[in-house]
């Protein structure tokens, strides 16, 4: 199974599936918020926080060595600036309690990586709440010739990730959107709604820019990501932030053509809960958006060859605008209605439930 993803919505499902089937994750590299933003402000690098998060979600923590390494990589520095710098120094010198638990080779790898990235950080860098995993991945990025995919592969190997993680692109870019009211917003963190800034008008368009000055740019897919798409037994546009996590992957040159050429089922799982990015959008408009982005790279492609099915749970949730059965039938897009949503108790989508449905789907459509 291959997922176009980013963010945390699929994290638990990915962790469950990793124990049972082979999964591949194509992850966006255009975010501009949180710990990623602090790094991108002082270094010319792609966003790597979502890649780090997915790699660690796939780690084989049945091993004590890996479990301790994952704990060290998941650690975030304190939010107090002086405490953050002090703890960072403890990490660099290998004396932090989490570092002392590591195997010698893992501790040395972390110490060298953090020391190397420290040399590249400007005085403007904010250490508070920084992700240790992001800092180490940035160090590997520079050590491997400014290449994110080899850095991700190295981290995958060290944590014995059960599955593959691919950066959708090595190119540097940020996300920009235009709202229906005509306003343009540059930067994923400014429109995703995760910090309370919900877009005041529906998102009408999305594209990539080189920087926050707004220069539009075309980027190309990382070759290994295209290869993974061509080999997939099932392609999935999963739950998650629709524009910044799912649609963002489809803006990249080569992805639409690879999806069209892939000889496998292609399934869209719309968000059953509220997604701040989807204000004013219905299920039809979401599918139309996916098709528009994919057809920009593969013009004239039939809808069913890009989005063959939608997976919904009408028993436990409601979808904005309802299920457009006639429209879907007209476009030869199938409806798969399965129970996988927990309507009352968290998590809203239990990873075990969705994983089971996807496994059954892969078998039935394979």
Locate the predicted segments by residue.
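Conserved catalytic alpha/beta core of Sir2/sirtuin-type deacylases, generalized to analogous enzyme cores
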Residues: 1, 8-15, 22-25, 34-36, ...
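Generic detector of intrinsically disordered, low-complexity, polar/charged segments
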Residues: 3-4, 130
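Electropositive, gly/pro-rich neighborhoods at or near active sites that engage anionic ligands
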Residues: 30-202, 363
């Amino acid at each position: 199974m291959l997922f176009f993803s980013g963010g945390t919505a699929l994290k638990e499902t990915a962790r469950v599936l990793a124990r049972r089937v082979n999964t591949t994750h194509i992850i966006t590299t255009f975010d501009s918020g949180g710990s990623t933003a602090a790094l991108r402000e002082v270094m010319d690098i792609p966003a790597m926080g979502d890649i780090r998060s997915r790699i660690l979600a796939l780690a084989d923590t049945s091993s004590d060595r890996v479990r301790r390494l994952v704990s060290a990589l998941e650690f975030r520095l304190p939010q107090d600036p002086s405490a953050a710098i002090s703890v960072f120094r403890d990490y660099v010198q290998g004396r932090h309690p989490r570092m002392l638990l590591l195997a010698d080779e893992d501790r040395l790898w972390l110490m060298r990586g953090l020391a190397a990235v420290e040399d590249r950080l400007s005085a403007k860098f904010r250490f508070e709440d920084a992700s240790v995993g992001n800092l180490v991945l940035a160090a590997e990025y520079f050590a491997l010739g400014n290449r994110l995919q080899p850095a991700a592969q190295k981290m995958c190997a060290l944590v014995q990730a059960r599955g593959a993680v691919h950066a959708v692109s090595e190119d540097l870019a940020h996300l920009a959107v235009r709202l229906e009211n005509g306003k343009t917003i540059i930067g994923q963190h400014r429109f995703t709604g995760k910090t309370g800034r919900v877009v005041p008008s529906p998102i009408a368009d999305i594209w990539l820019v080189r920087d926050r000055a707004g220069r539009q740019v075309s980027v190309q897919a990382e070759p290994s990501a295209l290869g993974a798409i061509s080999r997939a037994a099932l392609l999935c546009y999963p739950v998650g932030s629709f524009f910044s996590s799912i649609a963002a992957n489809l803006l990249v040159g080569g992805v639409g053509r690879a999806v069209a050429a892939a000889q496998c089922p292609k399934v869209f799982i719309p968000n059953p809960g509220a997604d701040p990015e989807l204000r004013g959008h219905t299920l039809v408009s979401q599918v139309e958006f996916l098709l528009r982005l994919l057809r920009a790279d593969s013009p004239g492609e039939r809808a069913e060859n890009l989005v063959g099915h939608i997976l919904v749970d009408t028993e436990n949730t409601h979808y904005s605008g309802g299920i457009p059965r006639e429209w879907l039938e007209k476009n030869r897009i199938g409806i798969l209605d399965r129970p996988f949503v927990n309507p009352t108790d968290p998590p809203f989508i239990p990873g075990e439930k969705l994983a089971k449905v996807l496994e059954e789907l892969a078998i039935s459509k394979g």
